[in-house]
Amino acid sequence: MKLCGFDVGLDRPFFLISGPCVVESEQLQMDVAGRLKEITAALGIPFIFKSSYDKANRSSGTSFRGPGMEKGLEILAKVRRDLQVPVLTDVHSEAEIPVVAQHVDVLQTPAFLCRQTDFIRAVAQSGKPVNIKKGQFLAPGDMKNVIQKARDAAREKGLPDDVFMACERGASFGYNNLVSDMRSLAIMRETGSPVVFDATHSVQLPGGQGTSSGGQREFVPVLSRAAIAVGVAGVFMETHPDPAKALSDGPNAVPLKHMKALLEQLVSIDRVIKAQPLLENDFSC
């Protein structure tokens, strides 16, 4: 698959989707995107900047949602233009899709909406690559149906049908907790789409702080190393210069100062794993 000018797949180095969870200010977006561009360029990691103009599924109605579509897209467009990096953001309704698609390179669907057929079809017909997140409630094998909906919709419009990614972000494990079943990364390959591991939302504790979600960012390195060892096309990882002051998902964000060291580890593992064929491909009887 070709994504933002680079090739992605299990025979290529992993790519990174990263940035602050939500657009907080123009300066923060520029600073974080600039630093991530420096780090990934030095490590040879294809990079897509991510941030949300609106967090439509916050735990509480009083939580910060973002600057809104108009201002948020203006800031994301500036990052894209001034820093010359591709940009990804999420859409939350069919009405938003045509507008957002004009300002970013990649669209993303929220995990909660992966079963909404009309929404998935509308995103697929945007003409943009789409990172489709697996719902916390969904079996990994069921992502085949989600991806197929997207492909069918794209083909109906005469659009490429090989521009969709399947993203794992953890599975609900009782109340206020998620677990990552690493088998899901291999199972989701059966979609025929590149698989992305969301390392930061996978350590989220949904609603764990009453009016907001908690998180265990100390496990981001653990799970991201495991995912790279399984073999994935990409890694999604939110970051912030000061997670304690982040306006959304701070408890599971990677401190920006630690991104370089973590990515260095992941690059080392990725090179070892992808240097040889994956053994599981030969284990069928």
Swiss-Prot record:
Q: What is its EC number?
A: 2.5.1.55
Reaction equations catalysed: D-arabinose 5-phosphate + phosphoenolpyruvate + H2O = 3-deoxy-alpha-D-manno-2-octulosonate-8-phosphate + phosphate
The main location class comes to cytoplasm
Question: What do the Gene Ontology cellular component annotations say?
Answer: cytoplasm
Q: Which terms does the record give in the GO molecular function aspect?
A: 3-deoxy-8-phosphooctulonate synthase activity
Record bears the keyword Lipoprotein: no
Its UniProt pathway annotation is:
Carbohydrate biosynthesis; 3-deoxy-D-manno-octulosonate biosynthesis; 3-deoxy-D-manno-octulosonate from D-ribulose 5-phosphate: step 2/3; Bacterial outer membrane biogenesis; lipopolysaccharide biosynthesis
Q: Which Gene Ontology BP terms does the record give? A: keto-3-deoxy-D-manno-octulosonic acid biosynthetic process
So what family is this one in? Belongs to the KdsA family.
Q: What is this protein called?
A: 2-dehydro-3-deoxyphosphooctonate aldolase
Lineage, please? Bacteria, Pseudomonadati, Pseudomonadota, Betaproteobacteria, Burkholderiales
